[in-house]
Amino acid sequence: MKNIFISGGGGYVGTNLVQELLKDDYKIIVLDTFWFGNYLKKNKNLKIIKKDLRNINKSDLNNIDCIIHLASIANDPAAALDAKLTWDVNVLATYKLINLAINQEVKKFIFASSGSVYGIKKEKKVTEELTLQPISEYNKSKMIAERVLLSYKKKIDLTILRPATICGYSPAMRLDVAINALTFGALQNNLITVYGGKQIRPNLTMHDMINAYKFFLKRSFKKNRSTENTIFNLGFENLSILNMAKRIRKSLQINSKILVKKTNDLRSYRQNSDRVIKKGFKPEKKIEDAIKEIKIKFLEKKIINKESYYRINTLKMIKV
């Protein structure tokens, strides 16, 4: 399985994933709008298609063995900005992609869903068996996309991943996700602003996210397998926002002030990832590793306060 198609391969996760897979001698086709910039390095085994996923056609998937579907309107604020765009990209384009994949006899399909599809849960162990109760346009669209894909599982080797909030460096950086935003605030302003603080959020390092894709890329499963062998949580550190702030300050070894502000957003999310661990996947990094990596890149001036690092700001500026 050497020919990999990655939708959204120019994004925060995709940019790192592409470079890692190229090291393993995969041939990669990336389809992306590159709304947030193109940071992919030229490579003889990399083909770039600058195109909106909604406009994908059959020829884009010629001779493809596996699709890794990353493209989406990501996070709650960005998705709420234009609900129609969110549903068109996250659901309808996913429907189009899976149909073309089956018509082109693609063997494997790996989908980047979200750990937020569970909604607000009181359970301490949020496992894959729990009922999905999404509360935002973003996680509702991810849930429906999952259901669309599951209706095709008899026809393709399907894996659905539900990652927690990802942290760590990427050339296509994001400063609108928890650990990254708090770390940047500490480095840039010597201030960590926390809203609420008691909310629990699951975390996943970029390193482990990339390794998870590589893990499932190498695994061969039967079509129409059970949900237990199809859907996997990927979240390994369930932490309060205030705890994150304290660990960031300790990891950076600076005396940043932690400013706690009131908020109406008291949502807490937890994830249990025992299922994927039982399959043989093991996380290798902690949030401290991501924090230290961000510090290094900040000192190298590879992370600055750039508009494209905030997804909602960029979407407001462009006409889609």
Each PLM stretch: what is its role?
Residues 141:
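Active-site helix of classical SDR
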Residues 147-201, 206-215, 248:
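NAD(P)-dependent short-chain dehydrogenase/reductase
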Residues 4-23:
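N-terminal Rossmann NAD(P)H-binding glycine-rich loop of SDR-like oxidoreductase domains
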Residues 44-55:
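Rossmann-fold cofactor-recognition segment
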Residues 53-89, 100:
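NAD(P)H-binding glycine-rich loop region in Rossmannoid oxidoreductase-like domains
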Residues 190, 194-320:
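C-terminal substrate-binding subdomain of Rossmann-fold SDR/epimerase-dehydratase oxidoreductases
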Residues 7, 31, 67-70, 109-114, ...:
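SDR active-site strand-loop-helix element
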Residues 95-137:
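Conserved Rossmann-fold NAD(P)-dependent oxidoreductase catalytic core, especially the SDR/UDP-sugar
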